[in-house]
Each structure stands twice: as structure tokens, then as C-alpha cells.
């Protein structure tokens, strides 16, 4: 995906190791059915894999990037983090998303102004099955739009062959006029 490619590139740019952890959330029907606690099941799979990896690497603590702004949202994945003893240092230090951006800019990190990019599964309406094919369709559509100059966007999958493109108000006319 575009996010994975970005992560690899940025890790190389800033000189840190990058490791891809394979997960198998599609084997869990509770994830695939896409109920409102989908994130819990996905994060449980991720943190279970990280438990094994951290043990094999003799890593004592797994951190995540949860910040204080995330605490006011519905985030069932936070329960999975708690169950797996994942630490949220940004929350512990009282750091918000705006603080993260400010710190990253001050450290000249290339991602300081990157638009938010929630999980692709969040682009599929609750109750619609999450499938690899649907996620790939959303990812390819978003990548194509980004390559054609659109930023801060979402493509949402709806039942059947319907996709909804969400862009900032100043880009709506370009999408509607098919000026791509």
C-alpha cells in the first residue's frame, strides 16, 4: 500500500530499522464481519504478533502512537492495547496531535504535516464485510487520487459498486468536473 511504501521510505531517510509484521486478521470472523468493535479484533491480532516478536527480540516494552486527542474518540483498539500491556508514551506525557506535529516539524521530520490516514478498514461501512479485495480497491483509488494532486482525502466503500470520495471543500469542484 501507499502507507507501507511511505513507512519504508521514511525509515530509510531517518536511518531506523523497518520491519513488517504479518498479521492474519482475515482469519477472524469477528474482524471480517465488521461490527463496531472491528478495531479491537484487528489490534488484538497485531498486538499478539508483536508480543511474539518482542519476546524473540528481547524487547521489554511495546509502544504505540496514541495521543491525547485519541482518548475522546471511540477507539476499541485501546482496550486491546491495554490487554497486551502496550504503552502509550504520548498519552502519558499529555501530548496531543498538534503537539506531535509541532515536535516533528521542529525535528525536521518529513511527516510533520502529513494528513491523517486512518486504517483502510475504516473506509468500509459497519456491517459490510471487510475483504482484501475491498481494501485493495479503496487503497488503489486513494493512491490514484493522491498521484493526481488530491490530498487529505478518503474513499469509502459502500454496498455494491459504490464508492464515495471525500475531499476538502476546495477540491470538490475538481472531482465533480472530473478534472483529474
Language-model features: locations:
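ATP-dependent adenylation/nucleotidyltransferase module used to activate substrates
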Residues: 1-106, 147, 163, 178-180
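Secondary-structure boundary/capping residues
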Residues: 16-19, 112, 172
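Acidic-residue sensor for enzyme active/binding pockets
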Residues: 3, 142, 166
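A short, flexible beta-alpha/helix-coil linker loop
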Residues: 26, 125-127, 169-172
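A short interface-forming secondary-structure element
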Residues: 159-160, 164-179
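Generic alpha-helical secondary structure
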Residues: 47, 131-138, 177-180
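Mid-to-C-terminal catalytic subdomains of enzymes
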Residues: 91, 95-145, 149-159
Amino acid at each position: 500500500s501507499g502507507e507501507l511504501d511511505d513507512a519504508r521510505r521514511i525509515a530509510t531517510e531517518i536511518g531506523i530499522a523497518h520491519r513488517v509484521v504479518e498479521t492474519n486478521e482475515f482469519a477472524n470472523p469477528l474482524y471480517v464481519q465488521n461490527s463496531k468493535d472491528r478495531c479491537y479484533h484487528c489490534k488484538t491480532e497485531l498486538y499478539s504478533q508483536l508480543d511474539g516478536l518482542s519476546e524473540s527480540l528481547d524487547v521489554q516494552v511495546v509502544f504505540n502512537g496514541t495521543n491525547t486527542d485519541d482518548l475522546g474518540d471511540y477507539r476499541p483498539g485501546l482496550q486491546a492495547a491495554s490487554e497486551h500491556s502496550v504503552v502509550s508514551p504520548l498519552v502519558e506525557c499529555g501530548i496531543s496531535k498538534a503537539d506531535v506535529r509541532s515536535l516533528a516539524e521542529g525535528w525536521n521530520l518529513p511527516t510533520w504535516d502529513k494528513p491523517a490516514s486512518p486504517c483502510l478498514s475504516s473506509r468500509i461501512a459497519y456491517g459490510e464485510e471487510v475483504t482484501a479485495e475491498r481494501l485493495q480497491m479503496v487503497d488503489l483509488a486513494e493512491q490514484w487520487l493522491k498521484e493526481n494532486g488530491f490530498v487529505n482525502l478518503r474513499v469509502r466503500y459502500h454496498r455494491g459498486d459504490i464508492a464515495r470520495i471525500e475531499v476538502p471543500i476546495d477540491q470538490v469542484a475538481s472531482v465533480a468536473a472530473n478534472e483529474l
